[in-house]
Amino acid sequence: MLKDSLSSFRVFIGLLLRLATLVLVGASQGALKITFASLQDAHYRDIWLNIRLPRVLLAVLVGGALATAGVIMQGLFRNPMADPGLLGVSSGSALMVGVAIIFPVSLPAAFLLYEQMIFAVVGSLVVCAVIFLISLRHHHGGMIQLLLAGIAINALCGAAIGILSYVGDEQQLRQLTLWMMGSLGQAQWPTLLVATSFALPAMVVTAWLA
């Protein structure tokens, strides 16, 4: 038992070191290649520290969060093919972000940086609330009822996003498309810290309960 624990710990440390290496390499690649020697220059250091590094770290965080959500869904449905979008939660997030992009709203200056993040969370919470109400109303249906509800919500949100894409202008459509493709172009240290404060505790609790 102790031997297995030590082996798992070594594997974990090895993967962690490889991940750190990939983060450093990823942050140095791009249209402007940045070496460790060039970091002595303030201009290169600013690009590496304030533009590239937040994007790479956010990509790592999002990857971990999606993997955690996938594990939860697979455990919930007892199906290794289940994914985070199965219940329509991600579609609800995309729909609310689309609404925020196509029909801009006035927010206080302090919240402008987090606008899309706020709308995405609101959209996901709305879908979660709808699914919860459906499960309470039709509890006898079990997981099949939840699955069918998720398929219906996915279809409705997809249709609504299609309508938003039709009424939006070229710039709005491009912005929505980039967001749905997982663009990290707007990643900054403040948004990374907010995302980490939500995602990291969820991943830790999930690992602890596993």
Where are these regions (language model features)?
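Alpha-helical transmembrane segments in inner-membrane proteins
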Residues: 1-210
